[in-house]
């Protein structure tokens, strides 16, 4: 792997940006994990008596929680990332209005109402990738309790119809048309929303969990206005797609088989290859985050080459799927030459990374 002086300088800048991306992502993940929320009285005191905005008050409380002082880059990662959400935007959603379930237990699964406390932080949308591949989180909060439908298996929450779910599916809902194949059932939000579209004629859902299918059919599907469009097949989604012929009647595919970008990695790589084979427009839940995750790995390989002096022997063993992917990326790139900042920047674009995953053995 060779770098011109200009390309090397840019790669070193990207290594620093990658570190910031990871640090702020880890910060928010910790806040989400502990369901960190600020005491409403504390926030109100900061706002009413000290002139803080709700956003500034939350930022102050985060600094206090971690015992840190945010640096200059926090304007992008915190100030511009935080947004007060309006509950009416979500309560007026057609699915939310139609599916009025407070508590249903069926076998080991339970449909219930989860909630965010006032000023509790959550990911409201997929990340936004800015210039030079800065990954800006999209973080929301409500100023009063906000309830949403969720599904748990025994005591573990499995999926939720929270603002993140609604916002991250908007693009796919807009693009779906004709005969649609949906990989993964979940709470049926995506099928419900596209079933309302006149240009969506038929919806086939692939879900391998028979208990989730039964729960959906018994409690959620009866609330669909266009039940006649819905067909559910119990099968493994990857196996089903791999058996499809090029002349399949599907016009569009939407894949939602993972909980996060790490969980998605292998499934996504398999599916983008199938997308190319079938030549069917396909969208993937959290695709921006998935590609950003792969971009981080590529930049990690740059770090190894430019700073640590790694060689082929450092990319042989793999303890995790991420390690395996990094190894594959290294061997796919080891003979490449980067001659300019522009070339390197284009190589790290979403389209370029997707082509790399399709064409190389990663």
Role assignments for model-derived ranges:
Residues 177-188:
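Conserved class I S-adenosyl-L-methionine
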Residues 259-362:
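C-terminal substrate-binding/active-site "lid" region of AdoMet-derived donor-dependent transferases
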